[in-house]
Amino acid sequence: MIWLAVYDIEDDGERAKASAILQAWGFVRVQRSFYVGRMPRGKAADLLKILQRHVKSGHIALIPITDELLAKALELGRPPYAPLKPPKYAQIYVV
């Protein structure tokens, strides 16, 4: 399953730690506080527990999304998470 990880963390140290943890777990940064990764639901729950130990301020959400829904995303440009797309993914270009 694909997971979107988003956060709003005020503390700089906690924010840096959350970023490092997400990237260590294979998540790819899309924007400053938005990551995407692939893992089973049980592993995502484990990840959230680890994040909970290190982040005391702000909010973190792990949002599941299916391959089918990601394939329907409307995008412009090449996203950094393209390898997570199912093989049938067709890039949409707006002219």
From Swiss-Prot:
**Record has tRNA processing as a keyword:** no
- Identify the keywords attached in UniProt to this record, alphabetized: Antiviral defense, Endonuclease, Hydrolase, Magnesium, Metal-binding, Nuclease
Give the molecular function GO annotations. metal ion binding; RNA endonuclease activity
Listed cofactors: Mg(2+)
A GO BP term here is: maintenance of CRISPR repeat elements
Residues annotated as binding Mg(2+) are D8
Task: List the InterPro entries hit by this protein, alphabetically.
Answer: CRISPR_associated_Cas2, Virulence_VapD/CRISPR_Cas2
The record's Pfam families line, in alphabetical order, gives: CRISPR_Cas2
What EC number(s) has UniProt assigned to this enzyme? 3.1.-.-
Q: Which NCBIfam families match?
A: cas2 (TIGR01573)
Its biological purpose: CRISPR (clustered regularly interspaced short palindromic repeat), is an adaptive immune system that provides protection against mobile genetic elements (viruses, transposable elements and conjugative plasmids). CRISPR clusters contain sequences complementary to antecedent mobile elements and target invading nucleic acids. CRISPR clusters are transcribed and processed into CRISPR RNA (crRNA). Functions as a ssRNA-specific endoribonuclease. Involved in the integration of spacer DNA into the CRISPR cassette.
Q: Which HAMAP family match?
A: Cas2
Q: How does it assemble?
A: Homodimer, forms a heterotetramer with a Cas1 homodimer.
- Tell me which family the UniProt entry assigns to this protein: Belongs to the CRISPR-associated endoribonuclease Cas2 protein family.
Q: What is this protein called?
A: CRISPR-associated endoribonuclease Cas2 1
Organism whose genome encodes this protein: Pyrobaculum aerophilum (strain ATCC 51768 / DSM 7523 / JCM 9630 / CIP 104966 / NBRC 100827 / IM2)
